[in-house]
Structure formats: C-alpha cells, structure tokens
Amino acid sequence: MSPSAISSEYSNCNGTPDYALQSSEVSNFNGYDHVTWWVGNAKQAASYYNTVFGFKTLAYRGLETGSRYFASYVVGNADVRFVFTSPIRSQKCLPEEEPISDADRKLLQECHEHLEKHGDAVKDVAFEVDNVDGVFHKAVAAGADVVQEPTTLTDKMHGSVRTAVIRTYGDTTHTLISRADYNGPFLPGFRTAAPSSATVQLPSVPLARIDHCVGNQDWNEMVSACAFYEQCLSFHRFWSVDDSQICTEFSALNSIVMASENNLVKMPINEPAPGKKKSQIEEYVVFNSGAGVQHIALLTPDIISTVSAMRARGVEFINVPSTYYDTIRQRLKTEKRGWELKEDLDTIQKLNILIDYDEGGYLLQLFTKPLMDRPTVFIEIIQRNNFEGFGAGNFKSLFEAIEREQAERGNL
C-alpha cells in the first residue's frame, strides 16, 4: 500500500490529518471513468452489449492473463466503458489446499453473494479524478466507508494507475481513479482484446460519454444518500423535483440530482413517494433487494442515428402513446422559445423519442426496457441541445409507459 499523499503540515493537534484545511488540495472530478457490473457470465454479457448496443470489447482479464478466480471484459463506445466481471470458481467448493489469497477468497464470496442478492447488477461507478488521495481522504474524514485504501497498480509496459474505493448507497461502490501516468488498454492486469470474429456489419451506434447515473433508494433514504455526496465528495444539489411534479394516477417519486463542483459528474437519487399502487422505484427495490443503480444515461450527438441503429440491432425501448406527440406538436406551435427543432418530429415519433425543453434549448431522450429478467437496470439514451435538465416535462409520460410494463409483469 502506498503512503498517503497528504502532507503532515495539515495534521491537527491529535496528529491526524485535518482534511477540512485542504479543500483546495482536493481534486477535480473529470467525469465517469467506467461502470463495473457483476454478472453471472461476463463473456455473454459483453457479447450482448457489443451486438445490441454497439460496443466493442477493448480489454480482457481472465485465466489467460493469470486471473484464476475472476473473468472481466471491458467494452466501450467512444468515452463510455462498461466492465463485466464474473466469478469463475465456487468459493464454497474450493479445496482446502487451494492457493488462493485471503483477498481473492473474500472477493469471491462477496461476488457470489452479490449475484444471489441482486442478480446481474451494477457494482461500481468509477470517477476519474486528478488527485485520488485528496478525494479519498476528504471523503473518509467526512464519514465514507473505506473499501480500498489508495493503491498504485503498475504495468511495466504501460505505466501506473492510482485507485481507491469507497462505499455509497446499498452495495454500490465508487472507485476513484487517476490515469495520468498510464497508456495501457484499461488497467494493469488487463490485455488488449482480440479482434472480433464477426463477419456481419451491423449499423454503428454513435455515443459520446456517460451523462448521468441514477440510484434508487428505499423509502425515506434519498436525503441521507444525497448527504453522502454533499459531505463526502463536495457535490452540490443541481436539480430536484418532488411527488407533486413526478406523479401519475397510481404512483409518484421524489428525485434530487447531486453534481460535482464542475458539474461533470451528476448522480440523480430517487425514492418512492406515497401513491395508490407500487411505483417503479418500489418495484426496483424489491427485485434488486435494496438500493442500487437504476439506470445509466448515455449521451449521444445524434439520437436519431443512435436509436435507429439500436432498434435495428434489437434493443427494446419503452412504448410512447401517439397522444404524447399530439400534445408536443400543439405545445411547439403555441409556446415561446428561442430555438428550432433540428430533428424531424415525424421521425422522433416513429422512434418513440421523448422531448423536453425550455426557452433556451431542448433534450431528446428514450429509455430501454429492463435489461435483465429482474426489472431493475435499464439504459437511457439522451441528446442535449443547450439544455441541462433531466426531462421533468416527460416524467408523467415516462412513468405511465413504465407502469404499463409493470402491469404486464403483475407488479403495479
């Protein structure tokens, strides 16, 4: 373990670092580095996202690289990176003489327990930061739980990466990572993936980066989850709505968006609100067995091309009724705004894309159906045109569309 980069000049009278004195030393958040999923079969998960969502396998770690207990595939599209990790041995069935480290044994047990509890799910959301040690120590001083102390991972050919891990809501963690001294395929221990053997050319999917990552909480847990980001990571409240704004005939929710100081990382936090029936947030919490990541929003420069390509590849999106577009057409004719819609509205309707706007700009968005048999995680595709909101004008339509899916599952 590498020593802390915090200078002793910041120590208080007890000899422990006084992190409150060094806020200027704490790093900028440069965005999302990657999202790690713990899944039952990493190879198949990577193949699914490559085929259906237009990713490509970038890096691999497994038996061939000396990883005896886990296999990981890194897939990416532009600056979006997902890591799928699976255990490849049973922790309970290991022989007594198995030469496994205590750390690997513990991780193997945790991974199997996570899969039993949550199914295939997001385990970690990694942030790229300038100063891993500064962010980590400030977070821990403010009460964050430590998963991994700051550590340097080294690869003789490609350099080194500095990482640390803290715990957030549920069983989810945040890796803090700095790649300033690394030029390898992903992390030390990974190798560049072999080229795809596919012979059929599918339509390309233009993506840019992760726009935001949404966490669902159980009843009355949203405020405490937001407090973690405010106190431990110095995030601020960027945007919020309550059940008076996000509601249907049957259900409602509250939502607060927490953002890093430079707004490059945004973490919306949801919780259920009282309603006549079970909300999508409650359904998620039941089938995820607690709080966790509900969806990941992927920013695209061209949502028409992205959604068209994804539909051609087999992505299942939610269905939006035609009455939604009747209302949109009427609003666009009558409401004052300082922009013109660049995309063809008939094409937007054909693809079931949602639109929200204010006087200054607009966004286009669409949500997939849940990606697993458990109705938990899904993907959002979003395009922003001078608009930094989160589609509040679409929440009622979105909720109603999701409720129709819930009703089919018998969960409304």
From Swiss-Prot:
Pfam families referenced in this protein's UniProt entry, alphabetically: Glyoxalase (PF00903)
UniProt keyword annotations, A-Z: Dioxygenase, Iron, Metal-binding, Oxidoreductase, Phenylalanine catabolism, Repeat, Tyrosine catabolism
Domain VOC, residue spans: 31-179, 209-369
Domain of life: Eukaryota
Cofactor note: Binds 1 Fe cation per subunit.
Molecular function GO terms recorded: 4-hydroxyphenylpyruvate dioxygenase activity; metal ion binding
Catalytic activity annotation: 3-(4-hydroxyphenyl)pyruvate + O2 = homogentisate + CO2
Cofactor dependence: Fe cation
Disulfide bonds: none
Residues the record lists as binding Fe cation: 212, 295, 380
Pathway: Amino-acid degradation; L-phenylalanine degradation; acetoacetate and fumarate from L-phenylalanine: step 3/6
E.C. number(s) listed in UniProt: 1.13.11.27
Entries under SUPFAM superfamilies matching the protein: Glyoxalase/Bleomycin resistance protein/Dihydroxybiphenyl dioxygenase
GO BP: L-phenylalanine catabolic process; tyrosine catabolic process
PANTHER family in the cross-refs: 4-HYDROXYPHENYLPYRUVATE DIOXYGENASE
Family per record: Belongs to the 4HPPD family.
Name of this protein: 4-hydroxyphenylpyruvate dioxygenase
Originating species: Neurospora crassa (strain ATCC 24698 / 74-OR23-1A / CBS 708.71 / DSM 1257 / FGSC 987)
Organism ancestry: Eukaryota, Fungi, Dikarya, Ascomycota, Pezizomycotina
